[in-house]
Amino acid sequence: MTEIYDFDKSAWDIKGSIAPIQPTTYSDGRLVPQVRVIDPGLGDRKDECFMYMFLLGVVEDSDSLGPPIGRAFGSLPLGVGRSTAKPEELLKEATELDIVVRRTAGLNEKLVFYNNTPLTLLTPWRKVLTTGSVFNANQVCNAVNLIPLDTPQRFRVVYMSITRLSDNGYYTVPRRMLEFRSVNAVAFNLLVTLRIDKAIGPGKIIDNTEQLPEATFMVHIGNFRRKKSEVYSADYCKMKIEKMGLVFALGGIGGTSLHIRSTGKMSKTLHAQLGFKKTLCYPLMGINEDLNRLLWRSRCKIVRIQAVLQPSVPQEFRIYDDVIINDDQGLFKVL
């Protein structure tokens, strides 16, 4: 049976929203480059120079004979770097990059990015830019089906999103525990509700924010499990959650990300499941790629976070990540 408890809005009041990137254009219709800086942390890290960089832009034909034809809107996650340069200086260099894009396929459709321009201020991000990178196409492009193979393509940077990593400690993405199941355990999940205000252009105002669309996504935190063959009650789990003193924020890791920090006491078992870290990061790029693409330039705000307590899925239940399931005749095999 599922039990749901609401967190108090004070848990995300300070850092629970992201400002939009409002599109503006030059006289010829080209988008004006912009940079957005997000700080989801509490500011207790001594060195404030670490940041995560995420580029947004247009995938277009690189043929110089005429005006480039835009094919799709895409993104390029550059990862974490350390820099004291101003955001505007980083944006300027990013817009001057010559980034080649190529469509290919592996387990799924991929986009390959590599840069041909020497780096100066963006040197801390050279690992992605100079050695090339491959991403799941649906995670970094809104319409990969429109990208041709017979015409060279480039990625023209238009927007830059910088997330300052100002929290002390590590930003842990607890990937190993996300599929962990246990007998007689209670799964602790979060249901997050966002209110979305898409970037509609300067000077346009929506009078009633209650009419804005909302979207939800769910993340798994961990499991509450007793040593004996008994199950914790929902009320007891709620008490343990309240003692954790969870604080929530929105960041720009991989597009949009949920940041969680425990400011209180965490159970030893759950703390171990989370790698003994109290600062967690859940990028929507890996949780819900469709919602993440929708939020690339939008204003979004947390309006509700709920703790969802559910019985842990039995271990004998198999997880099928493939549409091909083995059959008794051996006609199909998942390798």
Swiss-Prot record:
Keyword annotations: Host cell membrane, Host membrane, Host-virus interaction, Lipid-binding, Membrane, Viral envelope protein, Viral matrix protein, Virion
Residue stretches spanning the membrane: none
Compartments (UniProt record): Virion; Host cell membrane
GO CC terms of this entry: host cell plasma membrane; membrane; viral envelope
InterPro entries: Matrix_C, Matrix_N, Matrix_Paramyxo_C, Matrix_Paramyxo_N
UniProt cross-references to Pfam families, sorted A to Z: Matrix_Paramyxo_C (PF23765), Matrix_Paramyxo_N (PF00661)
Gene Ontology annotations of biological process type: virion assembly
MF (Gene Ontology): lipid binding; structural constituent of virion
Quaternary assembly: Homodimer. Dimerization is critical for virion formation. Interacts with host ANP32B.
Record function comment: The M protein has a crucial role in virus assembly and interacts with the RNP complex as well as with the viral membrane. Associates with phosphatidylserine (PS) and phosphatidylinositol 4,5-bisphosphate (PIP2) at the plasma membrane. Interaction with PIP2 triggers matrix protein lattice polymerization. Matrix proteins induce host membrane deformation and curvature necessary for virion assembly/budding.
Similarity comment text for this entry: Belongs to the morbillivirus/respirovirus/rubulavirus M protein family.
Name of the protein: Matrix protein
Organism listed in the record: Measles virus (strain Hu2) (MeV)
